[in-house]
A protein has these predicted regions:
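Ribosome large-subunit tunnel/peptidyl-transferase-proximal elements
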Residues: 2-192, 196-199
Length: 202
């Protein structure tokens, strides 16, 4: 499922899932990823940049051993797709409340030593982000119009609050990561994974 414009999926699918719908506030950091403001006063993210970043991040993640990637989501609507993404690519996940010390305190049962952290929202996932910074881990993050990019090494501009957007982004990322490993094709993944199953049911 790709698009004649060169996008990974048709533009309409991004728009129907609200991937480009930002917030009414924007951070100075996110200005370069914003296209315009809609009639409701919401900043709209540039979908060409989102699409391009998905390609870049899929390639970047494949530089790491899958088991050394940790995907986190404290945000409710991100928990199911984040977990499914981690399972699909062979990574670890920590969804729901992130236990303080999980990246810094070896005495904890939840302690992990990943090589890279992937956050669903730098604001909601602040605890894990802080610990990753303290341990020198590279950080990839889904970033909305209001997010700050401080401590996020590779940003993926997208609506990180909607269950539809989060499901699509994580589904698409898993597809691209696996395609680069020659582990799937567009058609095979579409047949094996119903996008609806990736959506949070909260």
């Amino acid at each position: 499922m790709s698009d004649e414009t060169g996008l990974l999926i048709p533009l309409e699918l991004y728009e129907e899932s609200g991937v480009n719908i930002g917030t009414k506030q924007k951070s100075a950091d996110m200005g370069r990823f914003i296209d315009s403001v809609n009639s409701d006063g919401l900043y709209l993210l540039n979908l060409n940049q989102t699409d391009n970043r998905i390609r870049i991040i899929a390639s970047f993640l494949n530089q790491f051993e899958p088991s050394q990637i940790m995907v986190v989501s404290a945000r409710q609507y991100g928990q199911r797709p984040a977990r499914m993404f981690a399972e699909a690519i062979g990574a670890n996940s920590a969804v729901g409340r992130f236990i303080p010390g999980s990246l810094t305190n070896p005495a904890l049962r939840s302690y992990k030593e990943p090589d890279i952290l992937f956050v669903t929202d730098p604001a909601s996932d602040q605890q894990s982000l802080r610990e990753a910074v303290n341990t020198g881990l590279p950080i990839v993050g889904l970033v909305d119009a209001n997010n700050k990019l401080r401590n996020v090494d590779v940003a993926l501009p997208a609506n990180n609050k909607s269950r539809h957007s989060l499901a699509l982004i994580y589904w698409l990322l898993s597809r691209e990561v696996l395609k680069l490993r020659d582990a799937t094709t567009d058609e095979a993944l579409a047949e094996a994974n119903d996008l609806e199953e990736w959506k949070s049911t909260f």
